[in-house]
Each structure stands twice: as C-alpha cells, then as structure tokens.
Amino acid sequence: MEQQNNIPKHIVLFPDGNRRWAKEHGFPTLEGHRRGKENFEGFLSWCRARGVTVITVFGFSSENWNRPEEEVHYLMDLFEEYLGSVKDVEKFQREGIHVNIIGQKERLRPSLQKVIAHVEEQTKNNTQFYLNLAVSYGGKWDITQAVRKIVQEGIPAKEITEDTIAQRLSTAGLPDPDLIIRAGGEKRFSNFVLWQGAYAELYFCSKYWPDFGEQDLDDALVEYAKRQRRFGH
C-alpha cells in the first residue's frame, strides 16, 4: 500500500472472533486464541510500517473473568509467553516499542504481574511506538479509578475539568484514539476506552480476527482517510 497522508496516530483494536473461528474450523477454543495471538504480531508490524505510532488492543476484559477456567488460564499463559519471552522483549527494545499494560493488574496471577513489571521497566524509555495491552480492563473501571485518584488528591470539585480526569486514566500522556477497528462482526463498544474513544472513527470488519489480514487493515485505513472528523461539532 502506498503511504497515505491521513494515517491515524492511534488505533484501538478489538481482535474479536477467535472462539467462533475455532468452532467453525473444528478446532478447540484455545487454538483460536493461539492463532489470534500470532495474527496480532503481524498486525503490529503492518501498523508500524504504515506510520501508526500507538496501538491499544483489547486483550482481556473485566468481564472475561467469567469465561471457563481453562480458557482464562490459557489466555494468561499467552500473555505471559508474549510479554515474557526474551525474543519478544529484545524485539521491543530493538524496534523502540514502549509496552504498557492497562487494567486491574492486581487481579492477575503473581507470575504474570512479575513479567509485566519487567517488560514495562525494560521498555519505559522507548518512544518510537507505544503498545497498550488491555488485560483485566474495563472502560468504567478506568474512569472510576481516575475519579478515586482525584478524590485521594483532594482536588476541589470546582477545579475538576475533563483534563483532570484524562490525566489520570490508564492511557494518560498518549493521544486519544483516532480509529477503532473491531473484527468479528460485532458492532458495539463492549466497555472499552469509553472516555478516550469519544471522538474516534469506527470501523467494523465481519472477518473473525484470525482471518483479518494486511489488506483488511489497508481497507480500514482507506475508509478512515475518506472521513471528515468532526469531534462532536
């Protein structure tokens, strides 16, 4: 694809459809998640090649804790494998990727918390590309924890602005999303980046995430480039 001028700086990704993909192909649910992880690694490279500088991916929601125990355990294994492998951490360093895990980290198992702390520390000075991986995350939770911080800091009500809240969200310091891509055919927000995504453009793809390819990203970018963003005006 030729480089476009109107490339979104920040893309939010809903990599939906792993379980449905597995079912339709006669695979176990866990295989769908494994294929989804592999596809995300490609997606990251495609975005970087096109000039995107921030990716926020919905890895595991607050509500996903209600899924079968085996599935939850496997997903935690995938996160730990992806964030904890020496090869991947070296790649993050080599390519200047700043990794930030957003969500209720205290709910994660200790070994995963340790891996997260390590990769965040190792990549904290990288500035070429930002990867936000949402694990045990919910948009309502994010706003709630920001409000709690404001209360704890004793900020008077009359001094609270939108910026006061935005600066205390888990994505503070990064630009708000420009484009939200959701694979898998669903057309809803699912309690993700509710505040940050207020003025983002939405793009829905009917393909399940493991089948989402480079051309599908380009289709989303072409559609984004055609739109006139109004930011509520």
Task: Give each language-model segment a name.
Residues 1-233:
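Flexible, compositionally biased loop and terminal segments
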